[in-house]
Structures are given as structure tokens and as C-alpha cells.
């Protein structure tokens, strides 16, 4: 009898064996394979991508919560208690008592702007990123929350721009969302730019409820956002106050939003710009606002890194730089974190934001627009959230999807690839015009003296696929304790920009640690280009243009007093490049997006 019963069970279960196997073994048949997605029918009628199959649930009416937070130990003169305000929507399956995970956007941008021109509050699904989560994921049984950081919208307390207070408020919101009776205890965060920074702030606090983050061009630390090897972006002087002025309502209630860090932030920019190695703010203001390093030590969740390779608002160095020159992407992978990535040639946009994937100049992503938009992004993210927030489906592949400058997509284990070859080009091989770099101390000031290096082709016979962080080791002679070089690499055959690097000579060793430089000192500036993934045709020659400033960087405060003498004959360009066959795939594209020039 027992044997007969066992046989019956085996026969009944046989049709489900493949499903069980795909769940437990990571069988790709559970979802469409990445390489086959372009063959499927995608909903391309929106301004954002859609999951392949619509969910069956609907959103219940919006609810709100005020979370009281003890802030007595975080601000010197701020309120001892503050409130975080959030709004949230539950899916209809919670009516039957089903517990659900939460996807949240944490932001300063609710009720943001001047009183007569504010954005919507948390109780209204935000345009773009909010609609994307609400329309795609609530029908699949996810709760959705919008959280206002301290000092914004209806959240009280100080507007502590990416400081400890802001992180504490975010942490309490995550804890609240994860501990509600309708919650399954799994929280994921989503968002771009500042809304990516808030994810790292949450991760730095180490909540056990926070299972995964998906920062889109997310800021990982404030100092490297505003300064690249000491070179200051123009916005570095006003960031804290610019945000504060757009979050207050200009009434007596604003007094609670003002804390010492706001005043400190007002002085931090100019002090760091001019003081270099004497900067008093590195050890307090900026270190407090570095989060990816704290998350590395305090948190054990998963990360889906998404970034635009042509994003100069939050540049790719936010994830592809790191301690001792090791990219943070590698650091997290090597430490055992579940890490996945997607890097495309878009600017400061989402992967599926097709209406913004346009008006990019040559060398700034224009050559990739025809194949740029990821209409499969919602599905890709759905598979990620299903696994990390619900425990459904196979574990996603821990790879990174990379787009080259000509639009081609491929899969790598990591980026920069650890298997690249290094090509060293001595600048002594280049025809040189000029040896001094100097200019005016104004934003984008016209350079008085520049250096032009016209170099031979990387290869006369084969295309060169640059992939990674190109290094420029520039032997230089200082005239002052200051001075700056902005380097742009170009395909001189076509005139196309390839990439850029910038450095204050006091930061010649790389990173964020300045050193005093004396007049006449000879040194090597260890410059590193922003991440490049580009194909250079065989026989195309290379030009390197050295100026005092470029893009949106400030010229050095010392102006004409600090020219830099460059010695090309003792300088090198080190180029990481791929020499082996790569695994490429085709992405689904709409006619409108593919021709969105």
C-alpha cells in the first residue's frame, strides 16, 4: 500500500519537477533569458518600461505615518525629537492577511522648490520613478512607500544634508516599514541621484529589514561627488545651501530645520576649494557624509548598481573608485556581497527613460542612442526584487551588463574587467605643442596656456576596445602649492571625445588626501580618467589636450600664480583594453527610442 501511494505521488508531482528544479537550481527557464528578451513583445507605450506580465492586485487607498525619532544625540542645537513623514500604498492581497514586501523611495524632493512652485507631496505618487514602481510592482503584491527626509515636506527636524541626522531618520523609516503587521519584513529601496544617496545612508545604518538597494546613479559619498582628486566642481560651493533653500517654506516653522551643519556646509565648499591639505572639514563634515564605506562594514544586503557612463552629475567614479585604488564595485564583490550591475551610455537618467536618451553630443553617448534604452529594465528589476524581497525564482546572475560607446551591449563578470590587458603609451612618442598649463580662476575660464599631444594610433591593424580606468601618469614641475590639469582624450581622426580626467597637483598621489607641494618640486601626477568603454578603430590617432579646467570644474583659486610645467617625455598613458571575444546580446528597442536623436 505504501509503495502504491508513493508511486501515485511521484506520478502526480512529475509535471511540476521542472518548475521545482528551476526554482532551486537557478534554471534560466524560470524567466526569459537575457539574450532572448529582444524576441518578446514589450509594452513600449509608456515613458518607462513595464514588467512582461501585469499583476492581478490593485492598490488600496494611500495611508500616512509619522514616525517619532529621538534626535537628542545627533544635533548640537536641533530638536531632541523629530518626526519622519511617509505615505504608503498596500496591494489588495493584504486584505486577506497576506504579508508583503516594501519598495520605498526616500527623498528630499517631496514638496521641493519655492512655495509657489513645489513638487507633489508624499501622498501623491511621484512622477517618473514613483509611477514606475507603483504601476509595475503594487499589482504584483508589493507595498510602495514614499519617505520625506528630515526637514522636508511634513518631516520635522533639521535638514541635515546627507549627515548623521538624515541617516538616522531614514533608518527609522526602514525599521517602521519592515516591522508593520502587513509587512513580510523585507524592504528594498529604489531611486536616482540623491534618492540613491539615501539608500546608501540607510545601508550604512545596517537595518536587518533592508534586504536590497538599487541606486541609480546614486551618490555614495559627498566629497568625491564634488571634488575629483581635489578639482572642485562649480556646485561644490553651494550644494548644502541650495538644497536647504528649496526645502523650507519661509515661515516660522523653518526654525526647526536649521542646524549647525547647515552653517558648516556653507563654509565647507569654499574652505575645501582653497585650503587643500589645510582643509579643516575633511575629518568631520565630509567623512560624516561618506556612506558606501560605512555600509560595507555595517550591512549585509544586496546591491544592484546602475549608472550612466556619460553621467557628469553623479559621475561613474562614485562606484568605480575606492580605497587604495580598488573600485567599490570590486570591493563589494570580493567581500561576498550579492552584486549586479548595469552601466549604459546614458547621462543622469534611468535605464528606461527613453525620452531623456537624446540630445547627447558625439563622445557623450550620441553614438549609442540607437541601442540605449532598456525596455526590459522593469522585468530585470522584477526578477531581482522577487528573489531578494519575496524569495521567489532563481537567484539572479551576479554579472554586469555593459554598453560600449557604439551601443553594443555585453555581459561581464565585473567592471572594470579583471582580465583586461594594459597598454602603455609613452608620451615621448607624441608630437607636443606647449609645456605649460595655466589659466584664469573662473568657472570654465579660457586657458591661457595649454598642452596638445598628438599621439600615434593604439594599433594600426586592429580596433582597440578601451574598457576601464585609463591612467595618465604625468611628470610635472610645480610652481606653487596648487595648480590643476584637466585632460581630455580624443580620437583625433574623427574629433570624437573619448574621456576626461582632472587633478589638483596637491592631490598628485591620487584619491582625496592632499600633500603640500613646493615651488620647483618634480612629481608624477597619477591621474585617472572617468570610466571608459569605447572602441577605437584601427589606425585612428589619439590626441590628449591638457588645460587648466574643463566641463563644469572650477579653475584653481591660485589662478595664474600656479601654472604646471608638464614633461611629456617622462609621462605615460596606461590604457586597459579587451583583446578576447566578448559575449554580446541584443536589447529590445522601440522605433521612437532608437531614433531619439
Residue spans for each PLM region:
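Secretory targeting signatures
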Residues: 1-30, 597
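Glycine/threonine-rich phosphate-binding loop and adjacent beta-strand/alpha-helix elements that clamp
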Residues: 29-52, 61-72, 377, 389-597
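Accessory cap/linker subdomain of secreted extracellular hydrolases
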Residues: 30-42, 51-53, 79, 123, ...
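N-terminal cap/lid segment of alpha/beta-hydrolase-fold proteins
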Residues: 46-98
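Short beta-strand-to-loop junctions in surface cap/lid or active-site-entrance loops
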Residues: 85-98, 109, 289-293, 530
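Cap/lid segment of the alpha/beta-hydrolase catalytic domain
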Residues: 95-178, 354-368, 487, 551, ...
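A catalytic-pocket lid/entrance helix-loop region that shapes and gates access to the active site
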Residues: 165, 190-259, 309, 316-320, ...
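Short beta-strand/loop motif that positions the catalytic acidic residue
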Residues: 299, 305-307
